[in-house]
């Protein structure tokens, strides 16, 4: 197949099933493990070119953020949260109250909700706390960024974004905008990747193995929030 993204998603799902079967001793191996398949299948970028999602110029992000702040809709608040945290859309939209620790200013996303299937901690900056305070009086369920008992859909958030941007800009592309800001602002590469909850490999990762650098990431994300709100000195 040339639909490599679909194939990758299917392989990940099959791998979870086979892994569970191994735990139950119904199988002895995981035939969908890419470490095995990579010896007989070509890399997906050799089959079809990778299409990167359209990103907004990072210098345009403050203007977008200002427009979103003028809109009190839940989808607007969700987009603000996604921008401030640089999280993935689903992680933000489906965020629950039990994931938030305001005493420690930490947002803990369970492994089953992350792309890498590992628990991650993200700092809650003062700007993000403002969104939490907005949501608290209107709490209807365990989901934070919604006014109903269900999480916002991807369509709802995407529509909100398209009100202020071109059709080609995607919610996921906002993460790329943040990454470019990191590069232009001199943020150390490994820390920038950790802010995006990317797995970092090689010897560089080993130096960070004992810590997720939460305090350092809090500083970076606070600077990013100041940039979005035009409050940088």
Regions found by a protein language model. Give the residues of each.
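Basic, Lys/Arg- and aromatic-enriched nucleic-acid-binding interface segment
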Residues: 2-15, 23-95, 103, 115, ...
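A generic "alpha-helical surface" signal
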Residues: 5-12, 122, 215-218
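Conserved tyrosine-mediated DNA breakage-rejoining catalytic core shared by Y-recombinases
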Residues: 34-43, 85, 94-134, 200-206
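Catalytic-site neighborhood detector that most strongly recognizes the C-terminal catalytic loop/helix
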Residues: 47, 109-117, 129, 150-151, ...
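Hydrophobic alpha-helix feature that most strongly marks membrane-spanning transmembrane helices
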Residues: 66-69, 73, 97, 133-137, ...
């Amino acid at each position: 197949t040339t639909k490599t993204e679909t194939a990758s998603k299917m392989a990940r799902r099959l791998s979870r099933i086979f892994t569970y079967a191994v735990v139950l001793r119904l199988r002895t191996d995981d035939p969908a493990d890419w470490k095995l398949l990579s010896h007989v299948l070509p890399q997906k970028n050799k089959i079809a070119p990778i299409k990167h999602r359209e990103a907004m110029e990072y210098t345009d992000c403050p203007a977008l953020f200002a427009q979103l702040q003028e809109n009190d809709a839940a989808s607007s608040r969700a987009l603000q949260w996604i921008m401030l945290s640089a999280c993935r859309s689903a992680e933000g939209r489906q965020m629950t109250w039990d994931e938030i620790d305001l005493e420690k200013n930490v947002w803990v996303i369970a492994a089953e909700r992350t792309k890498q299937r590992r628990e991650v901690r993200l700092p809650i900056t003062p700007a993000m706390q403002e969104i939490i305070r907005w949501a608290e009086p209107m709490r209807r369920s365990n989901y934070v960024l919604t006014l109903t008992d269900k999480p916002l859909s991807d369509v709802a958030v995407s529509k909100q974004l398209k009100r202020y941007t071109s059709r080609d800009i995607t919610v996921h592309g906002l993460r790329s905008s943040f990454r470019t800001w990191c590069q232009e602002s001199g943020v150390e590469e490994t820390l920038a990747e950790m802010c995006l909850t990317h797995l970092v490999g090689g010897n560089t990762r080993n130096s960070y193995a004992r810590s997720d650098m939460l305090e350092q990431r809090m500083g970076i994300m606070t600077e990013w929030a100041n940039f979005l709100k035009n409050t940088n000195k």
